[in-house]
């Protein structure tokens, strides 16, 4: 399969298309035919040589993807209600800038109705981060107050939107007066 490889750390010119072996989905994973990938700050930092992939993760950049499920762990997919052929978006540890990638089933979401794959590929990192921390761990409820520090970031903006949608009162900080005004 084709994948984006970092051939030289630094500017985008160090990214080249190369050939890589097809990844294989293991227990609790699925294989996605990638149609869109997000670009995140960690991807840029990795390209510049300042962020190593986690141990065992692909060295191919790309942490957010959208595409079609090709295969996977049938039991894990059934528990998640995911079938072969479904459109999903996923948060992965690396490997998203390729024709295919492997994702943990628990880090996949169905592509929302009306969303293109390009739009869906922008969702996983911010939405998983906010949902996991604010709602799963923090158990935010309607009527409660949530302080969001760094409210002008992608994760901050997502936290504001979700907290308000679920009926919380939101207080926000940002790093500068300019960020607070915009």
Annotate each predicted stretch with a short phrase.
Residues 17-22, 66-68, 100-102, 108:
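Conserved hydrophobic/aromatic beta-strand scaffold that supports enzyme active sites
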Residues 127-182:
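Mid-domain Rossmann-like dinucleotide-binding core that forms the NAD(H)/NADP(H) cofactor-binding site
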Residues 6, 47, 70-72, 102-104:
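Short beta-strand-to-turn element immediately C-terminal to the catalytic PLP-Schiff-base lysine
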Residues 12-18, 50-51, 92, 128-133:
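Short gly/ser/thr-rich secondary-structure transition/capping motifs
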Residues 45, 76, 87-150:
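NAD(P)H dinucleotide-binding glycine-rich loop of Rossmann-like/cofactor-binding domains
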Residues 1-2:
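Extreme N-terminal starter segment of soluble prokaryotic enzymes
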Residues 21-38, 50-95:
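Glycine-rich beta-strand-centered segment in the early N-terminal region that forms part
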Residues 42-48:
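Cytochrome P450 core scaffold surrounding the K-helix E-X-X-R motif
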